[in-house]
Design a protein with these regions (language model features):
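Alpha/beta-hydrolase fold catalytic core
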Residues: 4-55, 79, 261-262
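Conserved HGGG/HGGXW glycine-rich cap/lid loop of the alpha/beta-hydrolase fold
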Residues: 42-91
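Active-site loop/oxyanion-hole signature of alpha/beta-hydrolase fold enzymes
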Residues: 83-123
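Conserved hydrolase catalytic core segment
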Residues: 118-156
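Catalytic histidine-centered segment of alpha/beta-hydrolase-like enzymes
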Residues: 240-249
Length: 262
């Protein structure tokens, strides 16, 4: 039976500092925690924190491990956190000529094999949420539970504001100062993913679908993703945008932990 997470946002003067980085750890540049794995012909960079059951963190487009600077200090108290730089981003390798959500999801499935991990909890934000959804279909036995925030499964105006689509199209076709990597990552967002809603019915693991009530991903699209995944849970964060994990980290973290622990 589908469950709806009801969230009441309580503002405090500490909401933006309680999970600030401590001990001057610079995520995505921590030699004590950093590792490389050879997967799918590239060097995939990841950092490991904490102990316990594995939880992999998947960041958004153009981001890095540091995108989860408010999540790692929290979740490392409960899990063995494996935060990954996606292909062609952060410190991970890759080619602008070969980049797709399917390929990135394949990288993460392969990394779990490399680390001899039978199954893991998965938390994905934005593009990382797309990757997590694909993982739940591609290597379903390896995804114990999946939490995604601000994910879309189609790139058209049913999911994104038309103004955003036009901006990406103009950037990809006319920006002469952007790097090949920037063009490739934006082109991927412009034309991918293309996952039929029907395919989501094949997902077997428990899934928490999250979004901000002012997210760039249209609420009706988030709702349709939730409705298409069997036994999924839904959480819409109030007064929140696409970056709710950074905007309201305390609330976000506790919500995800509650889902993982239930």
């Amino acid at each position: 039976m589908k469950q709806l997470f009801a969230v009441i946002l309580i503002y405090t003067s500490f909401s933006f500092i309680s999970f600030a980085q401590t001990n001057e750890i610079i995520y995505d540049n921590n030699s004590l925690a950093g590792h490389y794995a050879q997967v799918n012909g590239i060097n995939l960079y990841y950092e490991v924190y904490g102990s316990g059951e594995p939880l992999i963190l998947l960041h958004g487009n153009g981001g890095s491990i540091n995108s989860f600077r408010y999540q790692i200090p929290f979740f490392e108290k409960h899990f063995k956190v494996i935060a990954i730089d996606s292909r062609l981003q952060g410190k991970s390798g890759g080619s602008p000529d070969t980049i797709s959500y399917d390929l990135m999801a394949s990288d993460f499935c392969a990394l779990l094999d490399f680390l001899n991990i039978d199954s893991a909890y998965v938390l994905g934000w934005s593009d990382g949420g797309i990757d997590g959804i694909i993982m739940a279909m591609m290597c379903s036995n390896k995804v114990k539970k999946l939490a995604v925030s601000g994910a879309n499964i189609v790139p058209d105006s049913t999911a994104l504001p038309y103004s955003d689509i036009l901006w990406m199209k103009n950037f990809v076709e006319h920006d002469t100062t952007a790097s090949k990597t920037e063009i490739a990552l934006n082109k991927m967002m412009l034309y991918q993913p293309n996952i039929p809603y029907e395919n989501l019915k094949s997902i077997k693991c428990p899934v928490l679908v999250m979004s901000g009530d002012h997210d760039v991903i249209k609420p009706e699209h988030t709702l349709k993703i939730f409705q298409s995944i069997p036994n999924a849970s839904l959480c819409i964060f109030p007064d929140s945008n696409h970056g709710v994990c950074q905007q309201h980290p305390d609330l976000f973290n506790e919500t995800v932990l509650t889902f993982f622990n239930k």
